[in-house]
Amino acid sequence: MRDTYESPLASRYADKEMKYLFSPDMKFKTWRRLWIALAESEMELGLPVTQEQVDELKAHAEDINYEVAEERERLVRHDVMSHVYAYGQQCPKAAGIIHLGATSCYVGDNTDIIIMTEAMKIVRKKLVNVIRILSHFAEEYKDLPTLAFTHFQPAQPTTVGKRATLWMQEFLMDLEDVEYQLSKAKLLGSKGTTGTQASFLELFDGNDEMAAKIDAKIAEKMGYESCFAVSGQTYPRKLDSQMLNVLSCIAQSAAKFSNDIRLLQHLKEVEEPFEKNQIGSSAMAYKRNPMRSERIASLARYIVVDALNPAITASTQWFERTLDDSANKRISVPEAFLATDAILNLVMNVADGLVVYPKVIEQHLRRELPFMATENIMMDAAKRGADRQELHEHVRVHSMAASKVIKEEGGENDLLERIANDPIFGVTLDELKGIVDPHKYVGRAPRQTEIFLHDVVKPVLDRYADTETETAEINL
């Protein structure tokens, strides 16, 4: 539709699988599953619900008569009761026991939890794929020296693969958070208007033991281990905040990754994928802009800010419930998951297609490494009997002169030639070139990468060996 606003997260960025989870069809089919679980639990606990009624509900769990529900909602202005009515039209024998003892939050809140849980499983799957892709990259480039940067100024070299482990480590931390959230997932259950289960105590004629069993049965039928032990009318809105905090952390990790790629692309050391017919600029035809990484950064900023919504909502809920959560969470929660889905698709796409330019990396090392090697050069000369303080002064003078050539004349770094021509050092240019072999300055970076991949990453990937390997397709 060209005359109606559509969220770009749905129309442009997120995958079909994630979009379906937050669709009306998913929501209303889950409502029906919950009504079936409630009726079946009530039947098993001895309430006047028959197997015939339960079977009738199950027979129409999927074929929702949306037109009937929508017409009814225009009349009664209540979405839950409209769908109770529509379900009852299809299930006349069960119409009288649909939603028995429940409140709107029984279907609404439990459905929200189920959808968020399933959405988090998609996030988990894609996080694992991000880690898998980056592990291949780190393994391939674990030995390739490159300049490290602190304050975005050249620093002691690392390796391209070791740098990738830093990105991976943050995504692994995020995966731990996702796993923790999924490990403690629980439903609201059916606790009534203020969380006291008064309606069920009435249905069971004051039998506390029977009323207390309803939640456990519902949880089991819906595939959960438990429900919240206590609640008001709703599940604690802090759950939404915790969920979106996890997504915010993923966004932070992705933004860090994308910013590094953008800077590396500026240096022409590493580039994100660039399609054969892709246009970087409408005016500057030669440009290769890192638009995927820029989109990651843009969406990440949105998620980090969006995560404030449920935090503020949770902190401003009154007593057993207020409705000022509803409109906000209808927007903030789905959009956060859709944006995270989009980000992880982009990270997979970028990481899987990174292009490394070793010759450019080598050129940058040649320009900077002589300065970093001067301490080793001084120590070698001192061991041969030269005065350390004189050596230091000569290095300082030569370094300033070489730096001037680079910065003011645009020339190459000639520090090694200056040192070779200075008799105080007593060393040839060939000997100096051996001293400044970049592999000698990366410390334990290659070994650190190997250990990290074997001891930290491999156990995670082995645990998720059955996780489907994805190749992300994105809209440019």
Regions found by a protein language model. Give the residues of each.
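Glycine-rich cofactor-pocket loops
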Residues: E139-G161, E271-K287, E320-A327, D352-M372
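Long, amphipathic alpha-helical stalk/connector segments used for oligomerization, subunit docking
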Residues: Y302-R388, H394
